Amino acid sequence: MFCYQCEQTDRTGARPGCASAKGNCGKDSTTADLQDLLVHAVKGIAQYGAIARTMGVPDREAERFVLYAMFTTLTNVNFHAARFVALLREAAQTRDRVKAACEAHARAAGTAVPVLHGPAEWQPADDLAGLLKQAASVGIDAGLDTVGADIVGLRALVLYGLKGVCAYAHHAQVLGYERDDIYEGVDAALAFLAGNPADVDALLAHALDLGRLNLTVMELLDNANTGRFGVQQPSAVRVSPVAGKAILVSGHDLGDLHALLEQTAGTGIQVYTHGEMLPAHAYPSLKAFPHLAGNYGGAWQDQQSDFARFPGPILMTSNCIIEPLPQYRQRIFTTGPVGWPGVRHLEHHDFPTLIRAAQALPGFQATAPEQTITVGFGRHAVLGVADKVIDAVKAGQIRHFFLIGGCDGAAPGRNYYTEFAEQAPDDTVVMTLGCNKYRFNRHAFGDIGGIPRLLDIGQCNDSYSAIRIATALADAFECGVNDLPLSLVISWFEQKAAAVLLTLLALGIRNIRLGPTLPAFVTPGVLAVLVDQFGIQPIGDAGADLAAALARRAA
């Protein structure tokens, strides 16, 4: 295996990346290699998918499969090698179906039958050993000796950003929202990568194209979430348990949570959110369920201790699973793209087994003293008081805005974000999103003239809300986003964050501070380009970076 797609990748060798029997995320080499091969297979589907679309015979099920398959290869999503073997077989069958439709259309139209090469020609080996042999030649570092580390790193930037795009698009699709132009963009990016591009300018251009595509995808997901569950409202969320049977839901999928709330209504079971599910409490259609009891625990990297203490079953939706401990292995379930060997998997909102487990387990024996935090400051809530915010800026009551958000993780250096937020002066406002918020969301920030100093915008995909807030403020002040008293301090971990970063760059947003370390696939040569064109900076000392941000705006 060779993998350097996440922030926690091994950096102890001469070349950064996990290249042993097991990666730092817990992914074994077999699973890692099968994931590489699945990406290769999906490129073949996209090659024919792009042609099918121009012929007027698109295959919507194939397009949905591409999103799902790519999602399974994100960090901390699926560790189940057997499921990847099955997905590889399905990928070949899907590609052949799209290919056959293209050929049939060409023959009927009397035009040349398309003949494609590369991933479009791939056929799965008969057994696991054969599949692993195939995977050896299609990893992310394929061609390193020929094209060099910069080109391989840029290919990785495009691929990893695309993985994030596919994950967000899948979230929207399962809620019933999809768009042809998104599928077209995904196919185009995969087909581009299938050609093993080696031109720096073309790779950078495609990376920024993906950033623009991701903005469209995040807008669609925002429409999906608000269309299904209502507009986020500022809401107090209980973070201390109540007595009774309990289920914990982690991950990102609001549709799974809604289905579970419907199925547990009237059972006496309390449902709690964990990690990135916290913003669910701000959506009217979700918080209307009285047994959505609160949020339990912290960010994804705390799950082993959180889940071990939780007295009921756990449902993992979408990404962020890590190896289940023996203390809860028999009471954790996966759904959607998530998988772990030996863990029971539930499909299509089929939750009776999960509910029976909750009824059999003790639940919380007592109600703890109530503690709450506030969520729900999406763009509708913030822009609803935009006049008040603008007046506070003009009056000098608000000096600066900080967006401190993104993915959290366990690596050293992430306390930087806690220190930065807690040191922010009282005349500044901190906006946050993603699970990085757990670094400081219980700190008492107070308010400025009734405007909370901490505004929790939502999940990582709610970066769209943050962008809309920033552009609305820029319009109000008749300036560009880069001219606002606004600093972006971003914590990244995996491929969704890579997609969001590309979106920010595509919008021309400069001087982003990124950490706790820079992506391993961003080579010194590529970093020089990003610094020159976009002013990207690594994080340093929290106090010094804070002072620099305030000084730059004051100047």
Curated annotation (Swiss-Prot):
Q: Name one GO molecular function term.
A: metal ion binding
Q: Which Pfam families match?
A: Prismane (PF03063)
Q: State its Enzyme Commission number(s).
A: 1.7.99.1
Superkingdom of source:
Bacteria
- Residue positions, PTM Cysteine persulfide: 407
Check the record and name the InterPro entries matching this protein: HCP/CODH, Hydroxylam_reduct, Prismane-like_a/b-sand, Prismane-like_sf, Prismane_a-bundle
Gene3D superfamilies the record matches: 1.20.1270.20, 3.40.50.2030
What enzyme class is recorded for this protein?
oxidoreductase
A GO cellular component term found in this entry reads:
cytoplasm
Q: Which keywords does this Swiss-Prot/TrEMBL entry list?
A: 4Fe-4S, Cytoplasm, Iron, Iron-sulfur, Metal-binding, Oxidoreductase
Q: Which cofactor does it need?
A: [4Fe-4S] cluster; hybrid [4Fe-2O-2S] cluster
> Its function?
Catalyzes the reduction of hydroxylamine to form NH(3) and H(2)O.
Q: Which family does it belong to?
A: Belongs to the HCP family.
What is the recorded name of this protein? Answer: Hydroxylamine reductase
Query: In which organism is this protein found?
Result: Burkholderia ambifaria (strain MC40-6)
* Record gene name: hcp
